[in-house]
Amino acid sequence: MAEYLASIFGTEKDKVNCSFYFKIGVCRHGDRCSRLHNKPTFSQTIVLLNLYRNPQNTAQTADGSHCHVSDVEVQEHYDSFFEEVFTELQEKYGEIEEMNVCDNLGDHLVGNVYVKFRREEDGERAVAELSNRWFNGQAVHGELSPVTDFRESCCRQYEMGECTRGGFCNFMHLRPISQNLQRQLYGRGPRRRSPPRFHTGHHPRERNHRCSPDHWHGRF
């Protein structure tokens, strides 16, 4: 029996433990889930919840109407966000093996940033220290994640352009970075530093919002 239970742990056949939490590190039911969310006490991977804000979903003019943002502008904004977070975390906490950002729309996945460090102790230290940080006008909420193999977490249909669930799919829709940035970060090439958007200890002062790149970046 013990061998059987071990073999189905974290799968759909497991009626005790939540398979979605095991694979993705979050669950749309949250604390109301009828199955257990076994939070790891150590892991190489951390998740920074709802950290990325897609300007196509959030950009507004002063009167509150939606502001059109082109695909090119969105990619530039995303690459800048990705580079800043990747560089900040790697320089402060240790070598990063992989970083992924969800482009889903569901509350439990939207803007989640998953960072897999080479060493478990680096992930633990990052979670402890980031809990007192602010980024882009919001408090950073980080936790250790059970996700280690993102192939099990990603929506295969989305990768083939065939997902019928759209942004509310419960598997990860990962937003890619540009090829140049991919080579720059993972090829360990030279990086340019941008002004930091991480802040420590207190809520940054609000500014008037405009429909502009500075608004999307949340510079304070």
Swiss-Prot record:
Isoform 2 is widely expressed. Isoform 3 is highly expressed in heart, brain and lung, lower expressed in thymus and much lower expressed in peripheral blood leukocytes. It comes from the Eukaryota. A zinc finger (C3H1-type) spans 12-40, 149-176. InterPro entries: Nucleotide-bd_a/b_plait_sf (IPR012677), RBD_domain_sf (IPR035979), RRM_dom (IPR000504), RRM_dom_euk (IPR003954), U2AF_small (IPR009145), Znf_CCCH (IPR000571). Residues 65-147 form the RRM domain. GO terms for molecular function: pre-mRNA 3'-splice site binding; zinc ion binding. GO terms for biological process: mRNA splicing, via spliceosome. It is found in: Nucleus; Nucleus speckle; Cytoplasm. Residues 189-208 have a biased composition (Basic residues). Residues 185-220 are annotated as: Disordered. The keyword Metal-binding applies. Its main location: nucleus. Belongs to the splicing factor SR family. Interacts with GFI1, U2AF2 and C1QBP. RNA-binding protein that function as a pre-mRNA splicing factor. Plays a critical role in both constitutive and enhancer-dependent splicing by mediating protein-protein interactions and protein-RNA interactions required for accurate 3'-splice site selection. Acts by enhancing the binding of U2AF2 to weak pyrimidine tracts. Also participates in the regulation of alternative pre-mRNA splicing. Activates exon 5 skipping of PTPRC during T-cell activation; an event reversed by GFI1. Binds to RNA at the AG dinucleotide at the 3'-splice site. Shows a preference for AGC or AGA. This is Splicing factor U2AF 26 kDa subunit.
